From Swiss-Prot:
Skewed-composition ranges (Basic and acidic residues): 265-274
DNA-binding region: 19-78, 94-153
Residue ranges of coiled coil: none
Tissue: Expressed in muscles, as well as in primary myoblasts and myotubes (at protein level).
Compartments, record wording: Nucleus; Cytoplasm
Pfam families reported in the protein's UniProt record: Homeodomain (PF00046)
Low complexity composition bias: residue spans: 278-302, 319-329
UniProt cross-references to CDD domains, sorted A to Z: homeodomain (cd00086)
Residue numbers spanned by region Disordered: 1-24, 72-102, 218-374
Protein name, as recorded: Double homeobox protein 4C
Record carries keyword Nucleus: yes
Assembly description: May interact with MYF5; regulates MYF5 expression.
UniProt function note: Down-regulates MYOD1 expression and may up-regulate MYF5 expression. May regulate microRNA (miRNA) transcription, up-regulating the expression of some myogenic miRNAs, including MIR1-1, MIR133A2, MIR133B and MIR206. Impairs the differentiation of myoblasts and may be involved in muscle regeneration. Reduces DUX4-induced nuclear localization of CTNNB1/beta-catenin and its subsequent activation of target genes.
Amino acid sequence: MALPTPSDSTLPAEARGRGRRRRLVWTPSQSEALRACFERNPYPGIATRERLAQAIGIPEPRVQIWFQNERSRQLRQHRRESRPWPGRRGPPEGRRKRTAVTGSQTALLLRAFEKDRFPGIAAREELARETGLPESRIQIWFQNRRARHPGQGGRAPAQAGGLCSAAPGGGHPAPSWVAFAHTGAWGTGLPAPHVPCAPGALPQGAFVSQAARAAPALQPSQAAPAEGISQPAPARGDFAYAAPAPPDGALSHPQAPRWPPHPGKSREDRDPQRDGLPGPCAVAQPGPAQAGPQGQGVLAPPTSQGSPWWGWGRGPQVAGAAWEPQAGAAPPPQPAPPDASAASTDASHPGASQPLQEPGRSSTVTSSLLYELL
């Protein structure tokens, strides 16, 4: 027996073509007939619903929805009043026969499901005309299909990609960072909050070494823009500047790190040649630092275990601050070898003291810098 659909006589012509079905307004006589049937049996069978639908002039699927909504309202009211729900009364009535869907009908429904998992009333009515099935059964078919296959069909949510899922060179470009690394003692750096999964996905300003597969990169709240590398360093605190990453193809050649410029000078008065001092540095990692000409990283001068680094201009330093020429003053002598504290570090951290054993290279570059300044 073919069931009437809402498109036969109940819905006006202007309601068809919209995304959702138009709300059905019940007349007082229809509401009384429905409530009287509900008092007799809250769970009417298919035969009772069809007779009631024919009597009040409403399609049977709308009558079924009304009974479902009324049962939900009554159940909520009984729960608020702490009364037990009576449930079914009387003998159970027959249920609707299972709708048989042929292979061709299933193929049409599957193609429509692949295009749109949530078809509107107009699309469902069009499918009802093509398949010969009632629109209400098509709606139930789509509901069941969405429940069984939540990830299939159209309008699927896009997968959110992250830094680790993005291929090198793809996605949004990462901002250029100049990272700071917190050091408790010279040569010891704290681990970064997060580490990119691939060296190709590292943002500019992170530090790549030949010995390290992934280098730590700080969060944006702890980083400064690349243009701000010549900004003054903090007056106090145990922070070390980190040199920017070299361009592609130049990772195998170590470059000289930059000490922070003088705090009292402006950006225009600073000489970029005076700010940079020679000497390789290592990537800051937990534990003893491994210095060597392997790449750029956080500048972490070595010291003994008992003498921490208190900041710029205080305590022992590796290369010292940049020389500032004065009127009538002769250039200072060549830097002296490290003191006893650095010698004690050689025994505990042999890797960190290796960059200091290059007097020829250091004196040559320092002499050239002093000659240019004079």
